[in-house]
Amino acid sequence: MELKTIEAAEAKPAVSPEGEMMIAQCLAAAANGEIAAYFDLGVAFSTGSHGVNCDMIEAHKWFNLAAAKGHEEAAYCRADISDEMTAREIAGAQRQAREWLSAERRKAA
């Protein structure tokens, strides 16, 4: 089943096949600990690019993971989007980042 959005009385795919492929590749790379993939996912979610909805909590999570691994630009991006987020949203993003790390550690064990 393909998700659709309705615009101007026309149905169109909500996510392009290219966008789905890019996100899937980034998620796979992120699962292998690739810092650039964390950053790319942060960019995608903060801008709503590659067919994903703009989601600042998800973006903060990925920027946080990249920044924690030493990605300087991710740290700047995380700080920038934090200005647009509530304390509750930031706490949620931090919780999600910790959950991601915990899940990755369990997989590695």
For each feature predicted by the language model, list its residue ranges.
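Terminal, low-structured helical/coil segments at or just beyond the last alpha-helical repeat
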Residues: E2-A9, P17, M21, D80-A109
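Structural signature of tandem alpha-helical TPR/SEL1-like repeats
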Residues: A14-A24, V52-K61, R88-G92
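Alpha-helical tetratricopeptide repeat
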Residues: I23, L27, I35, F39-V43
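Short helix-capping/linker turns of helical repeat alpha-solenoids
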Residues: A31-I35, G48-S49, F63, K69-H71, ...
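Hydrophobic face of amphipathic alpha-helices that form TPR/SEL1-like repeat modules
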Residues: D40-G48, C77-S82
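Amphipathic, hydrophobic secondary-structure cores in small proteins
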Residues: C54, E58-Y76
